[in-house]
C-alpha cells in the first residue's frame, strides 16, 4: 500500500556459503537485490517427542475428535513494488536505503526471492504438472532447516542475527551473509534495516512490568549508546544465552510492508505482526519497533506473570471500554465473529528486559484440566486494543515536531497464538484467513445428496479427488475499507454535512482504508491544518473521518483447522479467500517440501503479468515504483496448524 521503501539485503540463515553456491549455481549473475525474500521456521523436535511423522495420505479422513492442534511450521515471503524512501524523521538525505530485507534469530532461515533464468519453463519433476517454478528454491525446499546445525553454522547464524533498531558497535557483531555475497563477493549493507525514529527511541520512566518484557533488541549483542558498559562476566553470560535464546524472532520489510514474528517454543506462544504502510515508512517502522512490547506490557496478569507473583483469577480487567466479543470454536459456524473496539489512538516505550524472568500463566496453572478456561479471552482482546491505543498515542507525539507524519499511516494485522487460542487484532484491509475442514456429518449428507443428482464429469472428478479434505475459508477479521458498505455508511452517518466524505471510492478522495494507524490529518482538524496547504483536505466538522478502532477476534483451534494465512492486502488484489487456501492446499499436497508462502507470491506476480499482457520476467524488469501500478507490496505468512506439512523441514 502506498509509495514506500524498497531494496534488498537477504539473510541466508543456517547454511554456509559453500552449500548455497553449490545448490544455486544456476542463479549466478541473476541476483536481484530489490525484489523480496522467503523465510521459514520449523518447530524443533522436543526431547521425548517423536523425531519423524508418517507420510500424509492423499485422502485423509477427519482427525480423531477431541484432538487439539498448535502451530508447527511458519512459511513466509514478501515482495516489494515500491521504491525506497527515507524516514521523515531521519537527518540523512540518503535515498539508497534497502527496500527488501530480512533478519532473524538462529532458528529462522531465509533466502532472497530469485527468478529462474529466462528459458523455456520446465514442468516440475515432482509428479505434478499443475505448478511451474518461476523462483529458485525457498528455504524449506533448500533444506536450510533440515538436520543438525554444526557449531560453525551456529556461529554464522549468531553473527547474522542483528538488530533492526539499535546502532552497531562491532563489525563482527553485524556480519551477515547475503545471497549476493555468495556469488559476487560483495559485502552486505552495514546499515540497520529499520532505523530508529529520532527522539522517540524510548521514553523515560519504568515500572515493575518493564523489567520482564522481552524485546527483540534484548536478543542481540548490540547495546545502545546510553546503556552502561557491561563487565566481562555479564557479557559471557549474554553470549552463552544467545546460543539458544529463549525466544526466536524475525523481522522483514518489502517496500512499505513490515513483518514481525516472535515466538517461544518453551512457553508455547507466537506473535505475528504485519504492518502495511502508506505514504511513508515511519508508521510501519514505528509499529515494528514498539507494538510488540506494548502488547506484552498489557498482557501482564492475563497471559503471563512475574516469578514470585500470584495471579488473581477473580480480578477485573482494568479496561473499562464497552464492547461485545464473540468467540469461535470447533462448531459449524463458518462466518467471521469479531469484536470492534472503540476509537483508539496508540503508544509504547522501548524497554530491554531479561527474558529468563518471563513466566507465562500456563506454567503456574499446569495442573488445570482446561487451561483455556482460566484465561479471560475478552480481557486479552481488550489488552491488545489498549496496546494499540498507547502505541498510536506515542506516535502522535512525533507529529508535533514533524507535521508531515500526519499524512502517513499503516494497516495493522496482529495475531497472537497461545497454545490452541488464537487472538487477532486488525485495522485496515489485511486479512487473517483460516483453512478449515468442513463438518464431517455435513459432508456425508452432501455426498448422499450428490448421489441423487446429475453431475458433470468435472464435478465428479473434483469431488473424487478432493473428497473430505475440501477446505473452507474462515476470515478471522473484518476488513476496513470503502469496499465494505457498512464502513461507508458509518462514515457518511458521522459526517452528514460533508457530501464528499467518500469521494471516488476513497475517504475524502485520498484513502481507501477506513481505519488505520496514524494518518492523523484524517482524524483531527489540527493535524490537517499543520500540513502545507497543497496537502490539506477540506475538513468539515471535528469528527474523525477514519479511526484506529480495531477488529478483535478470538478463535479456539480444533482438529479441523489446517493452516492460517496472514497477509497484507496485496495478495487479495489477485486472490479471493477461497482461491488462496485452495492454492496453498494444492501446492503442499503436490510439493510437501515446497515453500507455500513463496508460491503465493509467485502466483500474484504471474497473475499480475498475465493481466497486463506481460510475461513473468518482463514484469520484474519494470523499475520499482513504476511496478506499483501492476501489483502492491505483498507479505504472506502461512502457519501450519498440524503436526507437519513439509517433510524436508523436520
UniProtKB/Swiss-Prot annotation:
One of its GO terms (cellular component) is nucleus. It is an enzyme of class 3 (hydrolase). Keywords: Hydrolase, Magnesium, Manganese, Metal-binding, Nucleus, Protein phosphatase. Its EC number is 3.1.3.16. Disruption phenotype: No visible phenotype. Mn(2+) 1 binds at residues 276-277. GO terms for molecular function: metal ion binding; protein serine/threonine phosphatase activity. It holds the Pfam family PP2C. InterPro entries: PP2C, PPM-type-like_dom_sf, PPM-type_phosphatase-like_dom. The conserved PP2C phosphatase domain (240-639) is interrupted by an insertion of approximately 100 amino acids. PANTHER family: PROTEIN PHOSPHATASE 2C, PROTEIN PHOSPHATASE 2C 36-RELATED. This is Probable protein phosphatase 2C 36.
Amino acid at each position: 500500500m502506498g509509495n514506500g521503501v524498497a531494496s534488498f539485503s537477504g539473510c541466508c540463515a543456517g547454511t554456509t556459503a559453500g552449500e548455497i553456491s553449490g545448490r544455486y549455481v544456476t542463479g549466478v549473475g541473476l541476483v536481484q537485490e530489490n525484489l523480496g525474500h522467503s523465510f521459514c521456521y520449523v518447530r524443533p523436535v522436543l526431547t521425548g517427542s517423536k523425531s519423524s511423522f508418517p507420510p500424509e495420505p492423499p485422502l485423509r479422513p477427519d482427525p480423531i475428535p477431541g484432538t487439539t492442534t498448535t502451530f508447527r511450521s511458519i512459511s513466509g515471503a514478501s515482495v516489494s513494488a515500491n521504491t525506497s524512501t527515507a524516514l521523515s524523521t531521519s537527518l540523512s538525505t540518503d535515498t539508497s536505503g534497502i527496500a527488501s530485507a530480512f533478519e532473524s534469530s538462529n532458528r529462522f532461515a531465509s533466502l532472497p526471492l530469485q527468478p529462474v533464468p529466462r528459458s523455456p519453463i520446465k514442468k516440475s519433476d515432482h509428479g505434478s504438472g499443475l505448478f511451474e517454478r518461476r523462483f529458485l528454491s525457498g528455504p524449506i525446499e533448500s533444506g536450510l532447516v533440515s538436520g543438525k546445525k554444526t557449531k560453525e553454522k551456529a556461529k554464522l547464524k549468531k553473527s547474522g542475527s542483528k538488530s533492526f533498531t539499535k546502532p552497531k558497535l562491532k563489525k563482527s557483531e553485524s556480519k551477515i551473509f547475503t545471497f549476493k555475497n555468495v556469488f559476487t563477493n560483495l559485502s552486505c549493507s552495514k546499515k540497520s534495516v529499520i532505523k530508529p525514529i529520532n527522539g522517540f527511541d524510548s521514553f523515560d520512566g519504568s515500572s515493575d512490568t518493564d523489567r520482564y518484557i522481552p524485546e527483540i533488541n534484548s536478543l542481540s549483542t548490540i547495546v545502545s549508546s546510553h546503556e552502561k558498559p557491561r563487565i566481562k562476566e555479564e557479557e559471557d553470560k549474554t553470549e552463552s544465552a544467545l546460543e539458544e535464546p529463549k525466544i526466536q524472532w524475525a523481522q522483514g520489510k518489502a517496500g512499505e510492508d513490515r513483518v514481525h514474528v516472535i515466538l517461544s517454543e518453551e512457553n508455547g506462544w507466537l506473535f505475528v505482526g504485519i504492518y502495511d504502510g502508506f505514504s511513508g515508512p515511519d508508521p510501519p517502522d514505528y509499529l515494528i519497533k514498539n507494538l510488540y512490547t506494548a502488547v506484552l506490557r498489557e498482557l501482564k496478569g492475563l497471559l503471563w506473570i512475574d516469578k514470585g507473583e500470584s495471579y488473581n483469577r477473580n480480578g477485573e480487567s482494568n479496561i473499562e471500554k464497552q464492547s461485545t466479543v464473540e468467540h469461535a470454536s470447533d462448531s459449524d459456524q463458518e462466518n467471521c465473529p469479531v469484536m470492534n473496539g472503540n476509537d483508539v489512538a496508540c503508544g509504547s516505550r522501548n524497554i530491554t528486559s531479561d527474558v529468563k524472568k518471563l513466566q507465562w500463566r500456563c506454567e503456574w496453572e499446569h495442573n488445570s484440566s482446561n487451561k483455556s478456561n482460566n484465561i479471560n479471552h475478552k480481557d486479552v482482546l481488550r489488552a491488545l486494543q489498549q496496546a494499540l491505543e498507547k502505541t498510536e498515542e506515542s506516535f502522535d507525539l512525533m507529529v508535533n515536531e514533524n507535521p508531515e507524519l500526519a499524512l502517513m499511516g499503516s494497516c495493522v494485522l496482529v495475531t497472537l497464538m497461545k497454545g490452541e487460542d488464537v487472538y487477532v487484532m486488525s485495522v485496515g484491509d489485511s486479512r487473517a484467513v483460516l483453512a478449515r475442514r468442513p463438518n464431517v456429518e455435513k459432508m456425508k449428507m452432501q455426498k448422499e445428496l450428490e448421489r441423487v443428482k446429475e453431475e458433470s464429469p468435472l464435478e465428479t472428478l473434483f469431488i473424487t479427488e478432493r473428497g473430505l479434505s475440501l477446505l473452507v475459508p474462515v476470515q478471522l477479521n473484518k476488513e476496513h475499507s470503502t469496499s465494505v458498505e457498512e464502513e461507508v455508511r458509518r462514515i457518511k452517518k458521522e459526517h452528514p454535512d460533508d457530501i464528499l466524505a467518500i469521494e471516488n471510492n476513497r475517504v475524502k478522495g485520498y484513502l481507501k482504508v477506513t481505519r488505520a494507524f496514524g494518518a492523523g490529518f484524517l482524524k483531527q482538524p489540527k493535524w490537517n491544518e499543520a500540513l502545507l496547504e497543497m496537502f490539506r483536505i477540506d475538513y468539515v466538522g471535528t469528527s474523525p473521518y477514519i479511526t484506529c478502532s480495531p477488529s478483535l477476534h478470538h478463535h479456539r483451534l480444533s482438529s479441523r483447522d489446517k493452516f492460517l494465512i496472514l497477509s497484507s492486502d496485496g495478495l487479495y488484489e489477485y486472490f479471493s479467500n477461497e482461491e488462496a487456501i485452495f492454492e496453498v492446499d494444492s501446492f503442499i499436497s503436490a510439493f510437501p517440501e515446497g515453500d507455500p508462502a513463496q508460491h503465493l507470491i509467485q502466483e500474484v506476480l504471474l497473475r499480475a503479468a498475465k493481466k497486463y499482457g506481460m510475461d513473468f520476467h518482463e514484469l520484474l524488469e519494470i523499475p520499482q515504483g513504476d511496478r506499483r501500478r501492476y501489483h502492491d507490496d505483498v507479505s504472506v505468512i502461512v502457519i501450519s496448524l498440524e503436526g507437519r506439512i513439509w517433510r524436508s523441514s523436520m
